[in-house]
UniProtKB/Swiss-Prot annotation:
UniProt region (Domain I, interacts with DnaA modulators), positions on chain: 1-69
Domain notes: Domain I is involved in oligomerization and binding regulators, domain II is flexibile and of varying length in different bacteria, domain III forms the AAA+ region, while domain IV binds dsDNA.
Species name: Campylobacter fetus subsp. fetus (strain 82-40)
Subcellular location: Cytoplasm
UniProt protein name: Chromosomal replication initiator protein DnaA
Keyword annotations: ATP-binding, Cytoplasm, DNA replication, DNA-binding, Lipid-binding, Nucleotide-binding
GO process terms (BP): DNA replication initiation; regulation of DNA replication
PANTHER family attached to this UniProt entry: CHROMOSOMAL REPLICATION INITIATOR PROTEIN DNAA (PTHR30050:SF2)
NCBIfam families given in the database record: DnaA
Molecular function terms from GO: ATP binding; ATP hydrolysis activity; DNA replication origin binding; lipid binding
Chain sites annotated for binding ATP: 144, 146-148
GO CC annotations on file: cytoplasm; plasma membrane
Amino acid sequence: MLADEVIELLGQEISKNEMENYISQIKFNEKSSNSENIIFTAPNELVTKFIQTRYANKIANIFEVKTGIKPVISITTQKNRVSIKAKDIDVKQIRTQSSLLNPSYTFESFVVGDSNQFAYISSQQAAQNPGKVYNPLFIYGSTGLGKTHLLQSIGNYCLEHGKTVICVTSEQFMSDFIRNVENRTMNKFKEKYRNCDILLIDDIQFFHKSEKTQEEFFHTFNEIHAKKGQIVMTSDKPPKMLKGFEERLKSRFEWGLMADITPPELDTKIRIIKAKCEFDGINLSSDIIEYIATNMGDNIREIESAIININAFANIMRQEITLEFAKNVIKDQIKEKKDNISLENIISCVSHEMNIKPSDIKSKSRTKGIVEARRICIYLAKTLTPNSMPQLATHFGLKDHSAVSHNIKKINEIINNDGYFKARVEELKNKITSKE
């Protein structure tokens, strides 16, 4: 049957995990299908939504190759299931409570570059040797750089190897905690979170909202760690920079390994875009890919959103995806920050965060804190604005462009040798760009 051939070909392009857990569960609805409308039936809403979102277009492309006609792919949910057979029960669901795990987030699907290589290797080793190395593992970096992908890659790997995995956001942990306190069912809460092999907490920085939650997580952390269970957390900043956290909790975050993810370089962004296009069966020319990589920001989710929007508009309007078409579709998403960010905005933000006067930055003061703030401003100004070296020299009261270059070089040297300083500069950059 043609549908079987298509599914078999799809299986050659995706991971074994996804094939077994999702694609193998759908059935071709021959009675309701025709050459232009292909219908598959899935056993539940989870599988339906996942396949419709991730694979419908790829399945349609394979049908087009086989028949010359690109059909509309529909995934419907099987209804009126009277009984559940033993073989229908997914053991992984039993082992994964309150799980956010997305099976497409694997180590194999993660695009590695200089900006994330250390975090990637650390995550792999923590997954392969849970509780034995890098425990806890603390992954930090700005929004949309791949922290959640690595966190869930660890979860999916450990799940495949028979471990009990809990994967939740900090908000979910807090909500679960509050609900169990109100219901007086804390024994149930403790049994759930303290008896797992792997505890994964995404965006742990939001624990600052609740001292009671921090207290509970402190004891949860201690018990899991004592039992040699693996703990992995993600955050937008390193432990030392977390505000509103107890020192004893921050110190535990530093017990193991801290791995940062920085904004991807152009080459990595290009490879990420190509991987996304291949995964979703989207055909973009090299000039479009380079345009997206060069002009979008560093947030990978925003880049992927741009790709999805381009493809969706092309399908709806039945147009060929050209560079001009792509530019028009994502023009509102493009991060044209350089023309919008002023030098005064940078000085204002840096001086506020470093608790000095804006006038001090332009002064001749050689006080250590002021010199550092001035250098950070110059570094960010060169990174975020179109101003030339001579223009920056004039604005900051420096002798000439070589003095600007010297200040930028000093900041780069510190960034390369001090992870904490690097995170501070990155946080300042994010605050400046997010205000625009």
